[in-house]
Amino acid sequence: MTEADNGVLHTLFHSDQGGHEQVVLCQDRASGLKAVIAIHSTALGPALGGTRFYPYATEEEAVADVLNLSRGMSYKNAMAGLDHGGGKAVIIGDPEQIKSEDLLLAFGRFVASLGGRYVTACDVGTYVADMDVVARECRWTTGRSPENGGAGDSSVLTAFGVFQGMRASAEHLWGDPSLRGRKVGVAGVGKVGHHLVEHLLEDGADVVITDVREESVNRSTHKHPSVTAVADTEALIRTEGLDIYAPCALGGALDDDSVPVLTAKVVCGAANNQLAHPGVEKDLADRSILYAPDYVVNAGGVIQVADELRGFDFDRCKAKASKIFDTTLAIFARAKEDGIPPAAAADRIAEQRMSDAR
């Protein structure tokens, strides 16, 4: 066993505090595939979660990420009212360098070998066209194109759900769900953030954006000239008069550096795992910053892919995603009742649903 193998095993057995049911290490030498599939829980039903294609620095980092992400999917699916547990997959490597049809087909065979215990979908670095390829080897694939029996890109409903979470946050904090005149900062205007900006503008918000990809910023500012762009996330979170901060890129946006200087009164965004470490939710509460739990408000996408399994209906999905408004308000009420941060309140509600199902 190599030193790298030992590192992966150490991560699996000593860093897994979430009690995962199954972790599968996948390797196909012919295509260059290296992937990890993690099933956190099947208490509510088959594990459901996307496939992330990312150039992790080490295999240990990939394993740690998939454990964290799959656990988060259990909570997300529970809070979304879905009959699914939580799972996730990561493919290790730069998708722009190594993604190929053969690699995706090999990955599909690994997912298929689980016999339906895990259902995959798109995530960072994977797209509808990729799921169409995976589906050729695996029927437990969602996020496919409409012409291949799927629902297409889920970013539209994800953005809609985040918007509902923002409206609920505004209702809770200011007594009015309207965002008219509120200044909202969106960090990351890619697949989801771009659609979120449109909802915000339609509701009358003043929008400030940033993104590491200049082309994403240019797309938004070209389509919406009223949008203000700033250089980076640090500039965004320090924006004077910012009411709401929406992290919509990768996780860990709320950390020991960002929280102390954050000017917003609300955090509500599409990114997964926004809290960099345990305790950040308390830091936010200590600064009287209202945090809408990420896995609750960004559940629109998983609502869509779950619906795809029964024959996708957009109106049915949108109606379910609109309930994120009420769910978010219920979390804030539970947090106040129990004297805990909203993130802890959401966890308690999700854990109760999973416990009741066992």
From Swiss-Prot:
Gene Ontology CC terms: cytoplasm
Protein's UniProt keywords contain NAD: yes
Subcellular location as annotated: Cytoplasm
GO molecular function, one term: valine dehydrogenase (NAD+) activity
EC number: 1.4.1.23
Reaction equation(s) it catalyzes: L-valine + NAD(+) + H2O = 3-methyl-2-oxobutanoate + NH4(+) + NADH + H(+)
UniProt keyword annotation of DNA-binding present: no
Residues at which NAD(+) binds: G188, V189, G190, K191, V192, G193, H194
SMART domains: ELFV_dehydrog (SM00839)
Keywords: Branched-chain amino acid catabolism, Cytoplasm, NAD, Oxidoreductase
GO term, biological process aspect, one: valine catabolic process
Pathway: Amino-acid degradation; L-valine degradation
Active-site residue numbers: K88
Record's function text: Oxidative deamination of branched-chain amino acids. The catabolism of valine is the major source of fatty acid precursors for macrolide biosynthesis and a vital source of antibiotic precursors.
Family: Belongs to the Glu/Leu/Phe/Val dehydrogenases family.
Subunit structure, interactors included: Homodimer.
Protein name per the record: Valine dehydrogenase
Species, as recorded: Streptomyces virginiae (Streptomyces cinnamonensis)
